[in-house]
Amino acid sequence: FGETLEGAAEAIWQYNKGIVDATYDLIPAVKPQIAMYEQFGIPGLIAYKKTVDYCKSKDLVVIGDIKRGDIGSTSAAYAVGHLGQVQVGSRKYAGFDEDFATVNPYLGTDGIKPFVDVCKEEKKGIFILVKTSNPSSGEFQDRLIDGRPLYELVGEKVAEWGSECMGDSYSYVGAVVGATYPEQGEIL
């Protein structure tokens, strides 16, 4: 392949395959970060899809770290593309076919409901960003609104969205709470 996008993507795929082969019997899940693949364009996305499919073939749960969130129609397309099935003529196909995806709640219910709907239909799940572990997360997530940090309010919305789609005693909707903030995690 040489020094090409295809070459980089193939190297990533082979690396991932090696890691999965060495660990699949020791771990329950993987969480590939799609941006690391997207930077290599279409070849990178092909490597992402191959990685997802290979992990699923090894019975691993795949959490697509995609952090999507947009207006309703765009979120619906993201939800179908990552967790659902897209209609092509008379047939339906799974796009990336992850088991779970990470979602950004910043656009509100418009951006979350399409994911919740697909989760209910496909019996898959989402993890919504509530209190993340990145160093600058507090710039917005810790802002007080009526004396309460924003992350608490987001956590309440996650619980509300999650109560609408229960499956097998668990909700299809979960929260991302960074382990670097144990005090906030305990509150949530």
Predicted regions located by residue number:
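Conserved anion-binding
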Residues: 70-174
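Catalytic PLP-binding core of fold-type I/II PLP enzymes
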Residues: 49-70
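A C-terminal functional module that forms or caps the active site or interfaces directly
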Residues: 180-188
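N-terminal glycine-rich anion-binding loop in soluble enzyme alpha/beta folds
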Residues: 1-22
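Glycine-rich, proline-tolerant flexible connector loops at the mouths of alpha/beta enzymes
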Residues: 4-8, 31-45
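Acidic (Asp/Glu)-rich catalytic clusters
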Residues: 20-27, 52-57, 116-122
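Conserved, mostly hydrophobic/aromatic
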Residues: 30, 65, 101
